Amino acid sequence: MELENFKGQNKNELSMIEVAHAILAKSGEPMAFVDLANAVQSYLDKTDEEFRNRLSQFYTDLNVDGSFISLGENTWGLRTWYPFESIDEALIHAEDEDEDRPVRKKRKKVNAFLADAADDDDVIDYDSDDPEDEEVEAEDTTSDDAPAFEDLSNDDDTDVLPDGIEGQLSELNEDDEN
């Protein structure tokens, strides 16, 4: 493949992104990433090992570079081919196509620890025996406790302890000091 944009230039000095842009511009249609990568590799005359070492950077550059657009299913095109409005419409139509696909049935879950799922005799339902799970109505305890609290509010703060305990704690013997 000969690209007119790069006639007379050293292929070792060309970036893979520049070559990919020229290849897509020449072909005029979107290409799968694999085909685009192979075309870039063959144009730059890179060995498989050299190209494989730079392949991840090439893919990253395709994503980051604003002149390329991913069209889904790892197909790439030039952004200039698609007006902004058609990009939104293409994405919306792609979502509509997904809805037309048949819906996969969900598989029935199998419990590997039970020999027969229909035989529930040995299975214990732990959710139904917890009394804390049952809702209990809150009792009105304000009327019962109110007189007891009133008694405490009238309590005298000048309570005096018998001198026996306080006196023993505050007295120091001469023997205790040594």
UniProtKB/Swiss-Prot annotation:
GO terms for biological process: DNA-templated transcription; regulation of DNA-templated transcription. Gene3D superfamilies: RNA polymerase, subunit delta, N-terminal domain (1.10.10.1250). Residues 14-81 form the HTH HARE-type domain. GO terms for cellular component: DNA-directed RNA polymerase complex. Residues 120-178 are annotated as: Disordered. It holds the Pfam family HARE-HTH. Keywords: DNA-directed RNA polymerase, Nucleotidyltransferase, Transcription, Transferase. Residues 120-143 have a biased composition (Acidic residues). InterPro entries: Asxl_HARE-HTH (IPR007759), RNAP_delta_N_dom_sf (IPR038087), RpoE (IPR029757). One of its GO terms (molecular function) is DNA-directed RNA polymerase activity. The keyword Iron does not apply. RNAP is composed of a core of 2 alpha, a beta and a beta' subunits. The core is associated with a delta subunit and one of several sigma factors. Participates in both the initiation and recycling phases of transcription. In the presence of the delta subunit, RNAP displays an increased specificity of transcription, a decreased affinity for nucleic acids, and an increased efficiency of RNA synthesis because of enhanced recycling. Belongs to the RpoE family. This is Probable DNA-directed RNA polymerase subunit delta.
